[in-house]
């Protein structure tokens, strides 16, 4: 079973996105066929908070769309508490909307991508080198396709400049 604790630091009702995320991440949980329950937290944040988190913890000043902080646990710790705590994910709906428009994605695909991308980071996947990137992005594609979503990654370096 997957348990998701939601926190909303926006003035926007996020109930739709919570339900959408539950569906997406339940598919991801089933895809990996975990032999234990997992738990994670997702906080919906505004631009200022997303930028502050990115600056404080990653030393980048741009406004992030998703930021993940994994928790590492041993098998003994998982057995002791009965589930695996994955960590915390911060999602910025405003930045997701901007990128959906900029890259001509629908917002469901953009948000689905962010939920899966952040989830994979919580599991320890990364895209720092080309081999790891291929593995992570292939997993993203497979999980999104299971949810009838398609997401074509379009990278624009301007999105990650420090002056944003």
From Swiss-Prot:
A cellular component term, taken from the record's GO annotations: cytoplasm
Isomerase found in the keyword field: no
Protein localization: Cytoplasm
UniProt-annotated binding residues for Zn(2+): 117, 121, 127
Top-rank lineage group of the source organism: Bacteria
Record keywords: Cytoplasm, Endonuclease, Hydrolase, Metal-binding, Nuclease, Ribosome biogenesis, rRNA processing, Zinc
Main location: cytoplasm
HAMAP family: Endoribonucl_YbeY (MF_00009)
Protein name listed in UniProt: Endoribonuclease YbeY
UniProt organism field: Mycoplasma mycoides subsp. mycoides SC (strain CCUG 32753 / NCTC 10114 / PG1)
Protein's gene: ybeY
